[in-house]
Amino acid sequence: ASGVDRRELRKLRRGQYAVGRRLDLHGFTAKPAVAATIRFIEDARQGYRCVAIVHGRGNHSAGRAVLKEDVRALLRSHRAVLAYTDAPRDDGGSGAVYVLLRNRP
C-alpha cells in the first residue's frame, strides 16, 4: 500500500482505527456488490477515515470466493483507498476488510 506508513498500516491491521461505517454484502451477487462498494466508498469519504466491508469468506460459492476477490480487486485500484487489510478475527477476519480512506481533497 503506497502512501501509507508502517505505523498506520499496523494500526489498521490491529483494528485501532475507529470504524466509521460498515457495508455488509451478504446476499449480493458480484456486479451489484461491486457497484454498492463503489457508492459506499465515495459516500464514506465525506467524513470517515476507516470503514469496514463485510464480503464473507465465499463458503457458499462454487470454486472461488467471488465477492471477496472482486471487492479486494476494486480496493486495490480505487483512488480513494489508501490501504486495506483483513479485519481482526473478532470482527469478521478474512471475511471482512478494514479500509483506510484517503483524506478528501
Please tell me what each predicted stretch does:
Residues 1-105:
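Long, charged, low-complexity intrinsically disordered regions
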